[in-house]
Amino acid sequence: MRRLLKPIKDVGIVGYGAYVPMFRIKNEEIGRVWGVNGFPIQEKSVNNLDEDAITIGIEAARNALKRARINPREIRALWFGTESKPYAVKPSATVIAEAIGATPDLDAADFEFACKAGTEALQAAIGFVGSGMAKYAMAIGADTSQGRPGDHLEFTASAGGAAYIVGEKTSDTLAYFEGSYSYVTDTPDFWRRQHEHYPRHGNRFTGEPAYFHQIISAAKGLMEELDYSPSDFDFAVFHQPNVKFPLTVAKILGIPKEKVLPGLLSGIIGNTYSGATLVGISAVLDIAKPGDRILWVSFGSGAGSDAFSLIVQDAIEEKRELAPKTMDYVNRKKYLDYALYAKHRGKYIL
């Protein structure tokens, strides 16, 4: 049985863009408040008072359009992956589409699958363009992720996102998809019920049954279908809830950490949830050379992974200079203490 996901037409990325808010809080500051030592990362990004998943998505989408150099009205689908959408009943995708000038002749919808909502949207965009139904489709993954005060998730849950415009493969394409592979199981590792402010997690399911099983299975499935080995890839980006987990995956798969570190940003911006691998890939595209092959594997609790093989093309050299690079946002910092952080994140709930 053929398990590789590959559209009829070859498709690729014609534009990409990321956005990370400028505010930061150090893990040391969070630990000071809660009396905790030993931290999973160094610091994380924090959204401003007027920023949410929608505004992050808009900024990322605008950067993607700068690199694509296309009329936004040519985009026939805009799909937004997030688990922190501002409205329970009202699509966020329509707000983004209106803000970038893509309305009204397009399909728009919000996607949900915990931290892999962004790549879920990307899979749909690849299929939509690859079937011939549209010239361009945009997939966005962005979050202002939540963590209960004092919970270990609070040390990593952060804000950021990235957008990708998918189009038919041409010489103007920045990179193209060789194929993808998706893997899902019903694993109760993380959830948030309706009307609850913060997610809960089943600790014993978090590591091996959820994250490691899904990501490794998806990565191995993709490589098996494409008849590749880990050595065939120049870069690898895995979902990054922290620094330890993706480096452990790389070690298990036999991928040197030097191929992972360029896209591993969680140590300095935290876990951007639906944006995590999308932001990581954007950082890799900012430095990759034509001909480089990239392994891209997301993860979403509940649980599942999407794996992609991406080959960089010549057009990357010019187009990546047309918008701010990911590290430009990462290196732009203003630190908050815990009181201001709690205000920015709306943690004062009466």
Curated annotation (Swiss-Prot):
GO molecular function, one term: hydroxymethylglutaryl-CoA synthase activity
Binding locations of (3S)-3-hydroxy-3-methylglutaryl-CoA: C115, T156, T206, H239, N271, S301
Annotated organism of origin: Thermococcus sibiricus (strain DSM 12597 / MM 739)
Entry EC number(s): 2.3.3.10
GO annotation terms (biological process): farnesyl diphosphate biosynthetic process, mevalonate pathway; isopentenyl diphosphate biosynthetic process, mevalonate pathway
Keywords linked to the UniProt accession: Acyltransferase, Isoprene biosynthesis, Transferase
Active site (record annotation): E83 (proton donor/acceptor), C115 (acyl-thioester intermediate), H239 (proton donor/acceptor)
SUPFAM superfamilies reported for this sequence: Thiolase-like
Reaction(s) this enzyme catalyzes, per UniProt: acetoacetyl-CoA + acetyl-CoA + H2O = (3S)-3-hydroxy-3-methylglutaryl-CoA + CoA + H(+)
Class of enzymatic activity (EC top level): transferase
Classification via HAMAP family: HMG_CoA_synth_arch
Function: Catalyzes the condensation of acetyl-CoA with acetoacetyl-CoA to form 3-hydroxy-3-methylglutaryl-CoA (HMG-CoA). Functions in the mevalonate (MVA) pathway leading to isopentenyl diphosphate (IPP), a key precursor for the biosynthesis of isoprenoid compounds that are building blocks of archaeal membrane lipids.
Gene3D superfamilies attached to this UniProt entry: 3.40.47.10
Name of this chain's protein: Hydroxymethylglutaryl-CoA synthase
